[in-house]
From Swiss-Prot:
UniProt protein name: 17.6 kDa class I heat shock protein
Statement: the UniProt record of this protein carries the keyword Transmembrane helix: no
Keyword tags: Cytoplasm, Stress response
Keyword match Cytoplasm: yes
Amino acid sequence: MSLIPRIFGDRRSTSVFDPFSIDVFDPFKELGFTVSNSGETSAFANTRIDWKETPEAHVFKADLPGLKKEEVKVEVEEDRVLQISGERNVEKEDKNDTWHRVERSSGKFMRRFRLPENAKMDQVKASMENGVLTVTVPKEEVNNPDVKSIEISG
């Protein structure tokens, strides 16, 4: 295991040409510099989400430490789009408080994914446990066509 961080991502990085990703292209994302629509540069605004496909479903996982399920929205839109969003508010400051360090992220995030044709959009389920959001989108069963062998004469 390397102690040097990978600058250009890892084997699971999303391809720029991924037909299912509809996030806004950010050329500085892999270098650790980000540009956010809201002007925020927090890590929270750039929440990373894993998407894996199993034989039965598409499964999305997001680490959202410190968020309650009421602060997270999972929505499905027309045209097979899954949208995951949330907001963590900035802690209220008291004039008598002296801050020595502020490292926790706050702000909003929103990620959108276009799902393939086999997604059952009417059966999406979401759960949140220990700060990990899991969204499961079942897949349609694929009917394997009957294959008939043809005898070759000659």
